[in-house]
Amino acid sequence: MVSPIVLAALCGMILLALACVRRIPRGQVYTLRGRDGRIRTLGEGLHVVLPLLERVAHKIDLAGATVAVNDLRRGERDYRAVVYFQVVDPRQADVVIDDVEGLLRVTTRRLFDYAVLPDDTDARRRWLKQSLNDELRERGLLVARIDLAAAA
C-alpha cells in the first residue's frame, strides 16, 4: 500500500512537470523574462519553462498586423494611412511590443509632417515606408506596406 504522503508528492511532481511544458503555436514567439532580468525567446513547438524562475512576458504574433493612422494633415488636405507591419526580431521588439501601435502612429505623424515630403502620392508612400523602416528596423519591426489616401 502506498502512503498518502508519497501519493500526494508524486501527484505534485507530475503537476509541476506538466506546468513546465509550453506549446508555442505556429507563427508566434514567446518572450520569457527570468527573475534576473534576462530575456529568452521561444519559437514554435514544445519547450520546457521553469515556472517559478521565468514568466511569459509577451506573446508576439509574427504574421503581421495593421495600424490605422488618421488625422494626417498636409497643407489644406487631410489624409489617412494604414500601416502594415510585422515583427522580424522578437528579441528587439519585446521592448516596444506593448505600445507598438502608438509608436507607429506617432512616428508616421512625425514623418508625415516632414517639410520635404514628396508631392506625388506613390513617391510619398514609398518615402514614408522607407523612412519608417529606417527608424523601426533597430526595434525589430518591418513596415511591409502603407496605404495612403486623402480623407473623405
What are these regions (language model features)?
Residues 30-51:
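Membrane-cytosol interface motif
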